[in-house]
Amino acid sequence: AMARMGVRTGYVGKVGRDTTGDFFEQALVNLGIEPHILRGNERSGRCVSLVSADGERTMCTFLGAALEMRGDELNESLFDGYDCLYIEGYLVQDHELIGRAVRLAKACGLTVALDLASFNIVDENLGFLNELTDGYVDVLFANEQEAFSFTGERNPLEALDKISRKCPLAVVKR
């Protein structure tokens, strides 16, 4: 969406040496997004989104080559000319990678936005996510389940209040 509005956007990731990886990279180019794509030995990842009649969604993910990405593959030049690093939470379990990404982004003056991705990921990485949010995250996105896992608050407004004390901008989605 940002690229379509004329905002310079880029994507950093790792895909396989396969036709799916080629497709992903070309799709980014076609959308006006600068691809900073690394190639791994594993197959390219995929995600299937299942949506029930009442709107509940379940994401079935195979991260594939994305799991091969390492922090030492990132450098400051990847962040040159950008204003914001948006972290999609499915790779948060790689603390070294995400830690390096946020440190580099902050060193380059970027805003850091984090989408928590899944309550399961929050549950498994709560300590690390708190450290990230306290030290680096400027914008945090969470749905109600993720916000509950992150804060312990069942009421979305109370969860939003707790999150907003940790970072400048908090968003709790339904």
Predicted segments with their positions:
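Substrate-binding N-lobe of the ribokinase-like
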Residues: 1-46
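Ribokinase/PfkB-type carbohydrate-kinase core domain
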Residues: 25-39, 51-174
